[in-house]
């Protein structure tokens, strides 16, 4: 078996004296979609930020494409081919959709050009001249994904893409993520909506209070709603 594209081992991260992550380990293979699930405050976003170098871990290791990148600054991690779609869809609100994409575009080029992003996200093409601050929540999520793609990553970390969006828009966002997966881009997907994420992922992890409490096939977990309730303490009877 080949080494994973991303390998996180025994990661511990603190904010001041407060320990957030406790020996978190996970992996993402080349072209694989992996779901990282858990309730608010479980440590999902901190895990992503620790991988990206935005919140350096206090111990443990992060390896990407065989290279240890633990604690590297975020810009160096991005240059290696790691994209990020953050919670809250941060972007330049006073710049147009096109200008946001141009700022994020990889100067070295690659298969994901702005033209290709517009082909896969035709709504963005229609809105290329509109300022990002005037886009709807769903349109901003699509722009955030587009910004990550034009950097031509091998791996994208996607944080809560369904948050605050109407069901039809969520469906469209997940259609786009499915296309990315089919194109060979690896995805680490953080999501509170467990069943939604499990539909697209091959494997799933569950975090609880900064500790990893589950790892296994996504389809297996999706078929056991009692197990999801036990792991996440949530009612999934109508979810997904």
Where would I find each of the regions flagged by the language model?
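Catalytic Walker B motif of ABC-type/P-loop ATPase nucleotide-binding domains
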Residues: 156-160
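Helix-to-loop junction immediately C-terminal to a conserved catalytic motif
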Residues: 52
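Conserved ABC ATPase signature
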Residues: 131-135, 139
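The feature captures the beta-strand-to-loop junction immediately N-terminal to the Walker
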Residues: 37-39
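Conserved ABC transporter NBD signature motif
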Residues: 60-68, 80, 112-114, 119
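ABC ATPase C-loop
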Residues: 148-149
